[in-house]
Amino acid sequence: MGEPAFTSFPSPPVLGKLKRNMMPWALQKKREIHMAKAHRRRAARSALPMRLTSCIFRRPVTRIRSHPDNQVRRRKGDEHLEKPQQLCAYRRLQALQPCSSQGEGSSPLHLESVLSILAPGTAGESLDRAGAERVRSPLEPTPGRFPAVAGGPTPGMGCQLPPPLSGQLVTPADIRRQARRVKKARERLAKALQADRLARQAEMLTCR
């Protein structure tokens, strides 16, 4: 008997490297857009973020690194910039100055009307008291006011603000009495806090 004959099958043809992309055009376009967005995000993360504060000039945030050459990165033009003034606050302060609509200084009558608005019933009394004190000797000190400086009249002498509501003087005995009251109040507060702390500790022990 002879040896069995081996049947040889033809090998498939070699196709070689494909030259055409098998992805659909729409999917390929979406992939390119996604890769471009990812590249832009990586580029944005590599740059220093900008500090957005109340300052009108943006400055990059300083990243802390462990090397001696760490410096605040900024533009060269920022070196000569002056600190911006708060114009709104400056205008508010200017509006508080006692002056008339023409820009002139306000008279005692204008100030009297302002004081009557702020504290009704006290402006007239203060001005009457100022007029009565003007009759006295200029060297005689009056309670609640500083004596006039020698060499000329004090500006705004007739525009005295109303005195405080309590006209009595504070004596050292009043100060010592108030200090004793404060000390007693603090002692009562310390005792109350200690009792509360002990009660909380006892409650925690009973809950366990």
Swiss-Prot record:
The gene is MBD3L3. One of its GO terms (molecular function) is methyl-CpG binding. This is Methyl-CpG-binding domain protein 3-like 3. Belongs to the MBD3L family. GO terms for biological process: DNA methylation-dependent constitutive heterochromatin formation; negative regulation of transcription by RNA polymerase II. The keyword Transcription regulation applies. It comes from the Eukaryota. InterPro entries: MBD2/MBD3_p55-bd, MeCpG-bd_2/3_C_dom. The MBD3L proteins are encoded by strongly repeated regions of the 19p13 chromosome. The exact number of functional copies is unclear, and some of them may represent pseudogenes. The lineage of its organism: Eukaryota, Metazoa, Chordata, Craniata, Vertebrata. Keywords: Repressor, Transcription, Transcription regulation. GO terms for cellular component: nucleus. It holds the Pfam family MBD_C. The keyword Repressor applies.
